[in-house]
Amino acid sequence: MTLAAAAGASAAAVPSHLQTFLGLDFGTKRTGVAFASRMLGSARPLSTVRTSQSDARLAQVRVHVQEWQPEALVVGIPFHPDGAEHENTLRARKFARSLRGRFSMPVFEVDERYSTTEARSEGARDADASAACIILEQFLRGLA
């Protein structure tokens, strides 16, 4: 799915049979993980994967996929405030592509500007997992 479609995800863009999602707030050293249910319309932070190694990060994501059995993955894609791409935009997209190659489920990309900032401003104990939760909640709102 393209970013433009994901940013304003609609029921038409995301098939209604997809009900559960694992959200990922990608970072080069930490990746936040959260789970959401379309039926409940809510998300919950799970944990943060702490590694800078791509294979180790993907292995930890696999553990979460096996445990939570999501029907799709949602990856936050960072942008500058003006919408311009930067180095981490490309890294997050590469991460999303690697997820598509490893897991037999849809992977959606969502504009995640300010999610970590919002999580920190809310006093989250685990800002990365909370940012993943915010990304999923934004995604779910787009489906309504």
Positions of PLM-derived features:
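Phosphate- and other anionic-substrate recognition elements at nucleic-acid/protein interfaces
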Residues: 1-24, 28-144
